[in-house]
């Protein structure tokens, strides 16, 4: 069995042997087989994988930190713990870090926070893969904002932005994990959004930045797993240079990639890409 999330050391730095102890190979193989079956028979959109992602997330975070030590990825199981985690990275002189944050109190929603320390100032940007019209994202955002304000971190600038790329009900965890990795890989492209956050240009600090205002800040690679074609087209209308940009090792453009992962669900074109991403990430945890 996978250990309860609250009992796992999630700050990173565990060895491969310790990582493997979080989940048995046999259990993981069974999970992966079922995930692949769900994609094959088309039931993936109507399945709920939230609890599974909550349980596997600690192992994924440890694996990511072992592969990318400078990623500084942290898993925070409740917004109540976020401020002390941020304080720790500041005091340790960390200039850049990411926090995958869970709702806590038995909740299942995830978002991801990108942290940068620039000229003595702290910039925190919460990236919501869905939108803030839903209860889960709204509650997590409120709890996170309240926790940061309560701790009164010095010279700290916090904004919330919505990506609105998630359409299925239970993929916030794997979206947040994929975004965390992208925030690290594309870190040099994110300087402007953090500078604008510190200047107060990005948002007023009270209201989230809507997706159409966020789109100009982000490279097309952030939208690889966008589930809806309409949403992808909105991004490309704002960023036409992204249409011809190759986004992966298969030499696919973002539109090629969507078409190659397209599935018709309830009469709508939806991408199964993020579900395949979950399988790929779970497979990295398998031990020979």
From Swiss-Prot:
Extract one GO BP annotation from the record.
Answer: peptidyl-serine O-acetylation
Residues that coordinate or bind 1D-myo-inositol hexakisphosphate:
182-185, 224-225, 257
Q: What's the domain of life for this entry?
A: Bacteria
Q: What class of enzyme is it?
A: transferase
User: What does the record give as cofactor?
Assistant: 1D-myo-inositol hexakisphosphate
Annotated Gene Ontology cellular components are:
extracellular region
Describe how its activity is regulated. Answer: 1D-myo-inositol hexakisphosphate activates protein-acetyltransferase activity via an allosteric mechanism: 1D-myo-inositol hexakisphosphate-binding induces a conformational rearrangement that stimulates the interaction with acetyl-CoA.
User: What are the record keywords, sorted?
Assistant: Acyltransferase, Allosteric enzyme, Plasmid, Secreted, Transferase, Virulence
Any matching Pfam family: Acetyltransf_14
Task: Give its E.C. classification number.
Answer: 2.3.1.-
Annotated CoA binding sites: 109, 167-168, 227-230, 266-270
Q: Where is the active site?
A: 109, 128, 172
Catalytic reactions on record: L-threonyl-[protein] + acetyl-CoA = O-acetyl-L-threonyl-[protein] + CoA; L-seryl-[protein] + acetyl-CoA = O-acetyl-L-seryl-[protein] + CoA
Where it sits in the cell: the answer is: Secreted
A GO molecular-function descriptor: toxin activity
Q: What would changing residue 109 to A do, according to UniProt? A: Abolished ability to inhibit the MAP kinase kinase (MAPKK) pathway and promote virulence
Main role? Serine/threonine-protein acetyltransferase translocated into infected cells, which inhibits the host immune response and induces cell death by mediating acetylation of target proteins. Inhibits the MAPK and NF-kappa-B signaling pathways by acetylating protein-kinases such as MAP2K1, MAP2K6, MAP3K7/TAK1 and I-kappa-B kinase (CHUK/IKKA and IKBKB) on serine and threonine residues critical for their activation by phosphorylation, thereby preventing protein-kinase activation.
Family of the protein in this entry: Belongs to the acetyltransferase YopJ family.
Q: What is this protein called?
A: Serine/threonine-protein acetyltransferase YopJ
Species assigned in the record: Yersinia pseudotuberculosis
